[in-house]
Amino acid sequence: GIFSLIKGAAQLIGKTVAKEAGKTGLELMACKVTKQC
């Protein structure tokens, strides 16, 4: 029903946000390590 639809959308959004946050975090760490911030 509608609940599984919302749950599926929430999971998809969560995964996307986590992926973007992870990418941003890695870039931040890399620029700190190489001192190019």
Curated annotation (Swiss-Prot):
It comes from the Eukaryota. InterPro entries: Antimicrobial_frog_2. It is found in: Secreted. Keywords: Amphibian defense peptide, Antibiotic, Antimicrobial, Disulfide bond, Secreted. GO terms for cellular component: extracellular region. Disulfide bonds join 31-37. One of its GO terms (biological process) is defense response to bacterium. Expressed by the skin glands. Transmembrane segments: none annotated. Belongs to the frog skin active peptide (FSAP) family. Esculentin subfamily. Has antibacterial activity against the Gram-positive bacterium S.aureus ATCC 25923 (MIC=32 uM) and the Gram-negative bacterium E.coli ATCC 25726 (MIC=16 uM). This is Esculentin-2HSa. It comes from Odorrana hosii (Hose's rock frog).
